[in-house]
Amino acid sequence: MSNQELLQLAVNAVDDKKAEQVVALNMKGISLIADFFLICHGNSEKQVQAIAHELKKVAQEQGIEIKRLEGYEQARWVLIDLGDVVVHVFHKDERAYYNLEKLWGDAPTVELEGVIS
């Protein structure tokens, strides 16, 4: 599966659970961690967990190894490492506080209209 297809899979999974303000950053040449960061948020701990759970389920169904999953129990900032795509699922309040989009402001955003199937 290509990185772009992996990103599309992640976008569709978080969208299925009504994640808000879904933003993808192209990290190629900027970070050694991943090619893409996908950032989104939920409005409650339950929604954050539902988004993370859906992504985990879809990844496992596709045979994609989840390299790391952190923060699920607290549901304030869940990080799901899919290898070349790292997904950050925030609680709304934490997203505003950490503001990863500003922190990685030199990373171009990916137009999601072309990614969502």
From Swiss-Prot:
UniProt cross-references to SUPFAM superfamilies, sorted A to Z: Nucleotidyltransferase
Cellular localisation: Cytoplasm
Gene Ontology MF terms: ribosomal large subunit binding
InterPro entries: Iojap/RsfS/C7orf30 (IPR004394), NT_sf (IPR043519)
Broad class of the protein's primary localization: cytoplasm
Swiss-Prot/TrEMBL keywords: Cytoplasm, Repressor, Translation regulation
GO biological process, one term: negative regulation of ribosome biogenesis
Summary of the function given for this chain in its UniProt record: Functions as a ribosomal silencing factor. Interacts with ribosomal protein uL14 (rplN), blocking formation of intersubunit bridge B8. Prevents association of the 30S and 50S ribosomal subunits and the formation of functional ribosomes, thus repressing translation.
Subunit note: Interacts with ribosomal protein uL14 (rplN).
Family statement: Belongs to the Iojap/RsfS family.
UniProt xrefs under PANTHER family: IOJAP SUPERFAMILY ORTHOLOG, MITOCHONDRIAL ASSEMBLY OF RIBOSOMAL LARGE SUBUNIT PROTEIN 1
Protein's recorded name: Ribosomal silencing factor RsfS
